[in-house]
Amino acid sequence: KVLAADEPLSLQAHPSAQQAVEGFAREERAGIPISSPIRNYRDRSHKPELLVALDTIDALAGFRPAAKTVELMRALSVSDLDPFVNLLAGQPDADGLRALFTTWITFPQPDLDILVPAVLEGAVNYLRSGATEFEAEAKTVLELGERYPGDAGVLAAMLLNRMHLEPGEAIYLPAGNLHAYLHGVGMEVMANSDNVLRRGLT
């Protein structure tokens, strides 16, 4: 199908084959109708996808190296991020990234309402300083914060690779790969499934 995003879309992942089978069975046992808006697993299939850019595309896809995320968070100079910097610096690997992502998406809303604005202020100050290493990331955080105030996905964006595709370039997203399309037009080539797990930017 053709994807045309003129604004950031939801932060999402598609389940693996095993997760799809187990999730579908679990929701069937719970009696959740296939058409229900709270249903996650509408079939038993996994859903890897390939996105081919028809125009330029900006996206977030997959966890960036933990060390780079630590550098980014330190560059924003936000004291409220210090505990999370320490968490990831102490476990600078895929498990540490998943732990931090899980922490943020399960944060109570009152805590998000404090942390997200602090991060946005840090991004503004970073851009005003003239620093450029994380310019694209800081601008993305600001754009998402304006569009989705108080959303944990704004924080999660700091954990993901910021990608830019030119027409004809493509990105492959295996099942389980966390991603969000920000802007652009592309052709999605996917397995035959409607399973989407959304967690942020909604």
Q: Which ranges hold each PLM region?
A:
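Active-site region of the double-stranded beta-helix
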Residues: 1-169, 179-202
